[in-house]
């Protein structure tokens, strides 16, 4: 019997590209304020680079396009990481989480810089919906998913057995392998923004697949039969 549902954050509860473009907006505003470019031109440059190149090349391409910028690469990274993000949950997910919380214990495990991930959670206004949030990089980047540590910590905190937990995430390589390795059940929700690399989208044996979280209540009803 499932007692707890543990969620991933990025591209599971909200579209990660919203955070990415929100960060680019913040960098564009700062760059324009310091001089050397127009806000919209800077943002368009970064957005185009995001779709055409590796994400690590976005800021260098901006600096190449506007050589008169009064910002260093370090300045851009700092503004991007420290900005207050303009992001929102996928439609219908706020009420879904509230309903699930009436019958299940809810948790979250998320990778990434803890300050950035905490900023996302605050911006989404969802911290109070979860009994426990594990920011894996609090314990070292090497312990991010699929390392067993964040999953074991969640189970220990909630004091439940692995088979009583369902982990929901978009990335089978990180979420799926970590959850299954910890003995949890795993449900994969299709990533809809394309931020995750395509190679991680292959299914894992034993995973439960769904198009979006709005299908989760029905899956929970069917789960005893699915797991037989």
Give the label of every model feature segment.
Residues 110:
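Conserved phosphate-coupling serine/threonine residues in phosphotransfer and NTP-handling enzymes
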Residues 102-103:
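Structured helix-beta-strand junction loops
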Residues 2-95, 115:
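N-terminal helical cap/lid subdomain that shapes the substrate entry/recognition surface
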Residues 1-2, 98, 113-114, 118-228:
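Asp-based, Mg2+/Mn2+-dependent phosphohydrolase catalytic module
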């Amino acid at each position: 019997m499932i007692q707890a549902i543990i969620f991933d954050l990025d591209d599971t509860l909200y579209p990660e590209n919203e955070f990415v473009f929100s960060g680019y907006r913040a960098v564009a505003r700062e760059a324009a304020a310091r001089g050397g470019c127009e806000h919209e031109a800077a943002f368009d440059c970064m957005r185009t680079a995001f779709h055409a190149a590796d994400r690590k090349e976005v800021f260098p391409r901006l600096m190449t396009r506007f050589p008169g910028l009064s910002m260093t690469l370090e300045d851009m990274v700092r503004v991007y990481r420290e900005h207050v993000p303009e992001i929102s949950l996928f439609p219908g997910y706020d009420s879904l989480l509230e309903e699930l919380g009436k019958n299940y214990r809810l948790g979250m495990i998320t990778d990434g810089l803890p300050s950035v991930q905490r900023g996302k959670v605050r911006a989404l206004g969802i911290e109070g919906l979860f009994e426990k949030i594990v920011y894996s990089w609090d314990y070292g980047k090497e312990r991010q998913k699929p390392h067993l540590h964040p999953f074991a910590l969640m189970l220990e905190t909630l004091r439940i057995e692995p088979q009583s937990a369902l982990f929901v995430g978009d990335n089978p390589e990180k979420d799926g392998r970590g959850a299954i390795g910890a003995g949890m059940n795993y449900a994969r929700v299709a990533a809809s923004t394309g931020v995750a690399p395509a190679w991680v989208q292959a299914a894992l044996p034993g995973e439960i697949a769904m198009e979006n979280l709005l299908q989760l209540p029905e899956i929970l009803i069917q789960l005893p039969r699915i797991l037989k």
